[in-house]
C-alpha cells in the first residue's frame, strides 16, 4: 500500500504512524523533516513551498513504486506540505514498514534523498534580512 499526499494543511505525525503500522512488519522507519531556525548563519523567519502538483505526485508515485519493489516493503507513506511554514513546522513525513528493519531504513533513505533531487517542489527561505530560493527542490 502506498499513501501519497501534497497539501497546504498541517501534517499529522500520529495519523501517519497509525497508517504505516502493519501487523506483518517488524520494522518501521519514520522520517520527519522540520523547518530549521537557521540556515548558513541566517535566521529563518519562514519557508514558502510551492509545486506543480500533478507532476510532483507522479514523481512521488514513481519513487514509491521503485522503493516498494526494490526493498519489498509493505507500506510507504509520503506526505509533503506546501504553502507558508514557520520554524518548527513539518514540511515532510516519510514512513516505511517492512518485514525487516534494514529494508525499511534503506527504502526511507532512498525516498527522501530521491525526493529532494527529482520532485518539482520549490523552496524559498525568508530570513530576517532577506530571502533566497534554494534550488529547484526542497
Predicted feature descriptions by range:
Residues 95-97:
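Short hydrophobic/aromatic beta-strand micro-patches
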Residues 1-90, 99-138:
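N-terminal, polar/charged subdomain of small-to-medium soluble alpha/beta proteins
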Amino acid at each position: 500500500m502506498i499513501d501519497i499526499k501534497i497539501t497546504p494543511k498541517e501534517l499529522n505525525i500520529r495519523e501517519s504512524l497509525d497508517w504505516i503500522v502493519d501487523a506483518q512488519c517488524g520494522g518501521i522507519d519514520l522520517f520527519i523533516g522540520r523547518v530549521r531556525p537557521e540556515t548558513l548563519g541566517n535566521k529563518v523567519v519562514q519557508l514558502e513551498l510551492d509545486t506543480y502538483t500533478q507532476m510532483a505526485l507522479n514523481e512521488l508515485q514513481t519513487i514509491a513504486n521503485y522503493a516498494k519493489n526494490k526493498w519489498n516493503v509493505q507500506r510507504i507513506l509520503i506526505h509533503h506540505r506546501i504553502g507558508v511554514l514557520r520554524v518548527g513546522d513539518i514540511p515532510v513525513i516519510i514512513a516505511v514498514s517492512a518485514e525487516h528493519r534494514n529494508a525499511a531504513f534503506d527504502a526511507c533513505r532512498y525516498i527522501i534523498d530521491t525526493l529532494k533531487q527529482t520532485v518539482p517542489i520549490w523552496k524559498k527561505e525568508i530570513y530576517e534580512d532577506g530571502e533566497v530560493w534554494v534550488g529547484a527542490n526542497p
